Design a protein with these regions (language model features):
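Enzyme catalytic cores with a strong preference for nitrogen-chemistry domains
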Residues: 1-347, 365-374, 401, 406
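ATP/NTP-dependent adenylation/nucleotidyl-transfer catalytic domains that generate, transfer
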Residues: 23, 161-163, 219-220, 232, ...
Length: 641
């Protein structure tokens, strides 16, 4: 439960139709095993105490009483179990029979939620036996306990306030306006659905989409426990298709007819953070009754996969589609700006590195979109003290293969003249030595753009902006920054995608060699003709920083939780010890706060993903904010703990 993680499970126990005692025993057996694994929320199917396929037997008082007896037995057996359990049963209230979910915790019946929408079409005839539930909450006596009864019920954990449970049953989700929508607006971060969804061709895919989409719309965790083996097969079969989703992603799922259960951890803190960011998500709890309960606080062992590359889709097909979309977005943004400014050229400083390579590829696409020749892109290479033969050669080959205009400006003499003006010793390889070169390059590009009636296209990426790895008013400045919304880990895949689609073998080969070149600003003199200044040796691995960036900006998590997630995500990577993860996380926070002043005057550039740092859009932060609180939280952690 630490850091907002809740271990939850959806079950489909094998049962016997109308054998309540046996069914309750099956529930308890699975529940006891789940508690040993740390499960704090266990959801069982609709009518799991009786079986869904009892038909008119539901109208028999013997079956109704048998279900109550089974519930009472479960309450007694779960007094010492530290978990919230949901089971389905028929319940007679004031002479009407309801299809209900009972919510149990430590021997207490927290509440009973009746089903709202009763299907009465096709193979379903629930209105024959049952009455729809009402939103009005009333108090009823069940198993000797005074219990709230109604659809407008929420259940909140005192020890983890971000865990607020709402309940609906099967058809409720399939309706036009599911009760879970109102539950979420009233504050529910987790929805449990007790279901008895029979299996037909194509239904599993539709069911999966329903659950995923509802969790996305409601910014919640969603558990769907469906009836399985043991239900009557007189006219239907039930596959036990259990699903657990969070904010649009399926985290755990059982294969139909597998006879298994779905189990994972839900991140309730993340749901709270998403809702805090989304001001369209309006809170409305009118008419709701919230029942509070207690669970013993325990650290949840994470078994869910934490993606070490949250910006990059793991599936090759999805990744390719994502790359094509991003390239089109970048190109369209630049095309609009070129069109609006009546720019004759797009001027780009080319280094032979990844970022300038991507910017050049985007500029060529933009010209193609505008039905203009690639020659309207002016690529400029500006070798100086740190330029190597490899990067210089790659820059020239790339420009030739793309058909852009190419110009070389040797800036060493200009830089030396500038150093003489300001009294900088050329042998002192300090920050002035590095930044002076970067600013001269920007000066050349800006004036060249003026001379050719063009715009300077910025090449810096999102990761560099987060770390402030740019020279203020040097490569930090441009007239339009096409890469400003693209993290470094994704830049690689965009260039690789273009390499795979390259029109010529030479273009393919040069793009692959650029991908294989170490990331470097090449501002310090080369050693034996090789790059001497490796960016990731200085600021840390970009895959770590992109991971940290995602969880800081997208989720608003604190350092302790991000450190924990990183240890899970990069487990098994020998180079990423706890000490290394900690070191670069601390470095990230220090740089992120210290370098905001560069982002406060960022050139225009297109947003391409959910995380961006534009001061006019998604990230508004004062340039002089203090990192004290975040660094203090980190100080309380020790690598290895």
């Amino acid at each position: 439960m630490k850091d907002g993680f809740l271990k939850a499970a959806a079950f489909s126990p094998a049962l016997r139709v109308a054998d309540c005692t046996y069914n309750a025993q099956q529930v308890l057996e699975q529940l006891q095993a789940a508690v040993q694994r740390g499960v704090k929320l266990a959801v069982f199917p609709e009518f799991c105490l009786t079986g869904y396929t009892c038909g008119d037997l539901f109208l028999q008082r013997t079956l109704q009483q048998g279900a109550l007896d089974a519930l009472e037995w479960l309450l007694a057996q779960t007094r010492t179990l530290d978990t919230v359990t949901l089971v389905g049963l028929p319940l007679l209230v004031h002479g009407k029979l309801y299809n209900c979910a009972a919510v149990l915790c430590r021997g207490q019946l927290l509440g009973i939620v009746p089903k709202t929408y009763l299907p009465n079409y096709g193979e379903f005839y629930e209105k024959r036996q049952f009455t729809p539930g009402s939103t009005e909450v009333q108090t009823v006596t069940v198993c000797g306990q005074q219990v709230p009864f109604g659809t407008s019920l929420l259940f909140r954990c005192r020890q983890m306030p971000s865990f607020v449970l709402g309940v609906e049953l099967c058809e409720d989700l399939w309706s036009a306006l599911p009760p879970s929508t109102f539950h979420a607006l009233a504050g529910a971060t987790v929805i449990a659905n007790l279901s008895a969804s029979d299996e037909t061709v194509g239904k599993a895919e539709y069911r999966r989409a329903l659950v995923a989409n509802q969790s996305a719309r409601l910014l919640c965790g969603y558990l769907y426990a469906s009836a399985g083996h043991g239900e009557s097969t007189t006219d239907m079969v039930f596959a036990g298709h259990d699903l657990i989703a969070e904010d649009g992603s399926i985290l755990a799922e059982t294969a139909p007819f597998a006879g298994d259960h779905a189990e994972t951890e839900l991140d309730c803190q993340r749901m709270e953070a998403e809702r805090a960011r989304n001001t369209s998500f309006e809170h409305s709890a009118e008419g709701y009754v919230t029942v509070e309960f207690d669970l013993a606080p325990e650290e949840t062992v994470l078994t869910r996969r934490i993606d070490p590359a949250p910006f990059v889709p793991g599936d090759p097909q999805r990744r390719a589609a994502r790359c094509e979309l991003i390239l089109k977005m970048q190109a369209d943004g630049l095309a609009k700006r070129l069109e609006h400014a009546h720019a004759k050229t797009a001027v780009i400083g080319i280094s032979g590195g990844l970022d300038s390579c991507l910017a050049l590829l985007v500029a060529v696409r933009a010209m193609k979109q505008l039905h203009r020749p690639a020659a309207d892109v002016l690529a400029v290479t500006m070798p100086c003290f740190g330029t190597t033969k490899r990067t210089r050669s790659n820059a020239e080959i790339l420009c030739g293969e793309l058909g852009v205009s190419f110009q070389e400006i040797r800036i060493a003499n200009t830089v030396r003249s500038h150093f003489a003006d300001i009294g900088q010793d050329e042998t002192v390889l300090d920050v002035t030595f590095e930044n002076g070169q970067a600013r001269v390059r920007t000066l050349e590009l800006m004036d060249l753009a003026n001379r050719t009636g063009g715009l300077v296209v910025g090449t810096g990426d999102l990761s560099e902006l987060a770390l402030g790895w740019a020279t203020y008013n040097g490569d930090h400045m441009s007239m339009y920054g096409v890469n400003a919304g693209v993290p470094k880990t994704l830049v690689r895949y965009l260039v690789q995608y273009e390499a795979e689609a390259a029109a010529t073998p030479a273009l393919h080969d040069v793009l692959l060699d650029i991908l294989a070149t170490p990331v470097s600003p090449e501002l310090l003199p080369a050693k034996d003709g090789e790059i001497a200044q490796i960016t990731e040796d200085l600021v840390g691995p970009y895959e770590l920083h992109d991971f940290y960036l995602y969880y800081v900006l997208r989720c608003g998590f604190g350092p302790a939780k991000i450190y924990r997630l990183a240890k899970t995500a990069f487990a098994g990577r020998a180079e990423y010890t706890d000490a290394v993860l900690y070191k670069w996380l601390r470095n990230f926070y220090w740089r992120f706060f210290a370098q905001q002043f560069k982002r406060s005057c960022l050139p225009d550039g297109p947003k391409v993903g959910s995380v961006t740092l534009s001061p006019r859009g998604d990230w508004r932060m004062p340039s002089d904010a203090c990192a004290t609180l975040w660094l203090a939280e980190l100080e309380q952690l020790k690598p290895g703990e």
